[in-house]
Amino acid sequence: MPRNSNTAVKNRPKTTAPKVEVAAEERPLMRGADIVIKCLENEGVEVVFGYPGGASMELHQSLTRSKKIRTILPRHEQGEAFAAEAYARVCGRPGVCLATSGPGATNLVTGIADAFMDSAPLIAITGQVPRPMIGKSAFQETDVFGMTLPIVKHSYLVMNVEDIPRVIQEAFYIASTGRPGPVVIDIPKDVQQSSCRPVFPDKVNLRGYNPDKRISDIAVNEIAGLIEKSERPVVYCGGGIISANASAELREFAEKTNIPVATTIMGIGAIPADHPLSLRWLGMHGTVYANYAVDRADLLLAFGVRFDDRVTSKVSEFAKHGTIVHIDVDPSEINKNKVAHLPVVSDIKYALQQLNKAVKGKKFEAWHKQIAEWKAKYPFRYRVTDEVLKSQYVREFLRGDVNEIIMPQYVIELLDELTKGDAIITTGVGQHQMWAAQYYKFKHPRMLITSGGLGAMGHGYPAALGAKVARPDKQVIGIDGDGSFTMNIQELATAHIERIAAKAVILNNQHLGMVVQWEDRFYQSNRGHTYLGDPQNPHQIYPDFVAVAKGFNVAAERVVRKSELRPALERMLAANEPYVLDVIVPYTEHVLPMIPAGKTVREMIIEKDETPNLGDNKGL
């Protein structure tokens, strides 16, 4: 089955899944909606994020009778999709979201696309208009099946009530095996209302779908040989490591071979940030030393990655000096963006287990010496620039007191210190996302939940809710920008009503910061609708997030001065309830380093207009 494989159940050949042999007259008569909920219980579902409507209310009525499933009512379907996706990414099991037909289903689309791009197992169940009304432009009818074809792993339109048990069992299996992804199950209202004596299959048997792909012994030996011959190897790994629960195997591989490891943003946590072999992460805003190590590598071991443009930039120049080994469970990713010299389709956990039996260690002394020099010379760093000193933030909010400036990077550093790097961090999309990845030192997988491939603003706080539901024992903090936070601010109501103690730290610069940065770099600082404050009252911080939060009965406070920050963060972290901390920061700060789109590592901007002096290519 390809990554996208979609069929209406009425037109789909029956699978040959064995069925429990129970005489029909002995099986209880059940309504379709009750069968759906029973199937979810059978799959071990503990939480459903759902917003009811006319075409899905039968399912919600059935949920009220479930003793095993907690139903969380969000305040927008996009919020529920992000929450369910984050729940899945934190606990590793499929998240479930539920919406009605029409606008309810379309509001899920961004979350479904996000799960598809970032390979998260998501089950999106939608109500649909009754079967006789399909295709007749009925009230709240949309073709969610067709609409989501490019952004799902599989889709079902359930036209027969008897198919529900098989469909749901298949959906969970498909979503969580191979490369994880979202599955849509569209169920017409009259199917939910129909009755049958259901048969629950005891296992899934999908002909043509074989997610259990394994590396060959020949490939293992070839990779071991390449490592033996290499002088400058680098492991480049991504979210595939985390999805496969292969972080322990990756660390063992790195320590056995003594090969440095660079991750993508989606792979952050696959190896501890403070591990001696960690290069942190690479790409547009990644470390100088990770980017340059990949550029200089004579062997690139690409594990569970897709060579996306935010990592490779000018792809023809990416890792052009080295032999590329690409291992991924999804064959469609092999040679899609970058041709590999040794392509391998395999489950990465199994591949690493086999490699760990075959590889031998080397010292790579010269290589590690070079990397140590780059690390010492080019750490993540920031300073108070002239632009910050001249900013409205300093002039008006601080009355010129430069000792009280709050740099956004410092907020993340302090949060890392106070939580000892052990919090689950979710983000929206923008500058704050990059600073969170740069300055929070993640030690474990499934601790950074961000929107990577799709880059969806509004992701941060709903994701924090889903993460906190999945791990109520952990401190969960949504780091957001004022633009991104506003997009799903209504989920503060969900946090309060459902008693979900997820925190929010807003790096509030009154602008769309990342777009402003690009305006400064590439558009002569011409502002194209990136100011989020009140133009008629620029001296006011707008909106008043503290007042808004308190309107939802959520605790909140604003921080303007550096001396206020530590005690405010301590109060937030000590609170056993939802909490919003609105931190005012200057908008003139840029995320650095930065490789401009389509450029190379040699055109990386490090500080203001400084580019790295990384030497020539002698010895390559």
What are these regions, as identified by a protein language model?
Residues M57-R131, M133-Q140, Y289-D308, N335-N337, P343-V345, M434-G513, ...:
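Thiamine diphosphate
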Residues N4, T126-V167, K189, G267-K377, ...:
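Glycine-rich, acidic loop regions that bind phosphate or pyrophosphate groups
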Residues I35-V45, A86-G92, F116, I174-R179, ...:
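Glycine-rich phosphate/diphosphate-binding loops that line cofactor/substrate pockets in enzymes
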Residues R89, I241-V325, Q433, K441-D473, ...:
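Glycine-rich, anion-gripping cofactor-binding loops and their flanking helix/strand elements
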Residues K10-R27, E162, P198, H321, ...:
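Phosphate/pyrophosphate-binding active-site segments
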Residues T142, E170, I174-K229, H368, ...:
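Conformationally flexible catalytic loops at phosphate/diphosphate-handling active centers
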Residues A33-I37, E41, V45, L59, ...:
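Active-site diphosphate/adenylate-binding microenvironment
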